[in-house]
Structure formats: C-alpha cells, structure tokens
Amino acid sequence: MTEYTSEALYTIDEHETCLSAVRDLGTQSPDGVLFKRPLNFEWVDVTVADFLDDVYSVAKGLVANGVEVGDRVVIMSDTRYEWTVLDYAIWAAGAITVPIYPSSSTSQCEWIVGNSGAKFAIAEKSGHFTRLSTFVKDGDRPEGDTSAHLNRVLEINSGAIDILVNDGK
C-alpha cells in the first residue's frame, strides 16, 4: 500500500472550537450571510450576528432550565436551521449534544437517553416529542442509575426556540 502525506496548511489552536470560529467570524464580518433559511414561505438571510444572537439567547434558556457544564442534551430532529442553533447553544452552555436519529424507535431512544445520562431533550415533531416524553421523571437522576431520566422535553415545531429564549430572559 502506498501512503501519501502533505503538510497542513494551517493549525488549529488547542482551545479553538466550532463556536469560537463563528464568534471570530462575527467579529470580522458580522453582516456576512451565514445561512439562508425558510421563513413564511420565503428564503431569508441569516447573518453571522443574527445566528450568534440566536445561539446565545437559546443557551441562556438552556441554563435557565438547569442545563449545566458537562450535561448532555438530546436533539431528535432532521437537519434544519433550529438544529444548528440548538447544537451551538448547547456548546455555548458548556453542555454536550446527544443526537438521536428521527427514525429511532422508543427502545433505541431509551437506551441512548439512559446511556448518555441526558437530562434535557429537544424533539422536532410531535411524534418525537411523545417518544421522548415517556422518559420525563420528577427529580434528579439517582447516582449510578442508568435508566432514561429526562427533566424536560421541548418540541421545535411547537415553539421550543421561543420558549428557551423567553426562559433565558
């Protein structure tokens, strides 16, 4: 087998993250278009500044809901703008994203939620919401308990982003 290598064109700092890269871009070019997203049957521009505002507003809502550094937060959704905002907001809050495929069965969800130790979840649709809501329990997860135990589930299609933004005010 022949192996090929080349010198790296750049280096990534030890503390550089996807979030810090977008923050840096926001400093350099806040009005640059980062996304186009559907809104009211039209495609609208989302600037770097708009995206970062969304991210930090949602991150504050996650923290207001008890999400702490190192916590795991489930996202069960197809790829969409809100998924990206939530992913970055989870990172901004110091938490860890636990993705679950939208096609996952209830038993698969139960294993992922339990195994990851996630305590908060965001679902895209009502079916996903129903599936994840079966794991909502009162109180904190007991030490050493590996069963699925969520404190809260929100649904993107029912205003999860707005709820989190309001919770963070």
Model-derived segments and spans:
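Tryptophan-centric aromatic hotspots in well-structured domains and transmembrane helices
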Residues: 18, 22, 43-45, 83-84, ...
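Flexible, glycine- and charge-enriched loops at secondary-structure boundaries
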Residues: 11, 15, 44, 48, ...
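A short N-terminal helical cap/helix-turn-helix that marks the beginning
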Residues: 13-34, 53
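Active-site-adjacent beta-strand anchor residues
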Residues: 12, 76, 122
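Conserved AMP-binding/adenylate-forming core of the ANL superfamily
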Residues: 34-88, 105-114
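Flexible, non-catalytic linker and terminal segments flanking ANL/adenylate-forming cores
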Residues: 1-17
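Structural core segment of the AMP-binding/adenylate-forming
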Residues: 65, 92-168
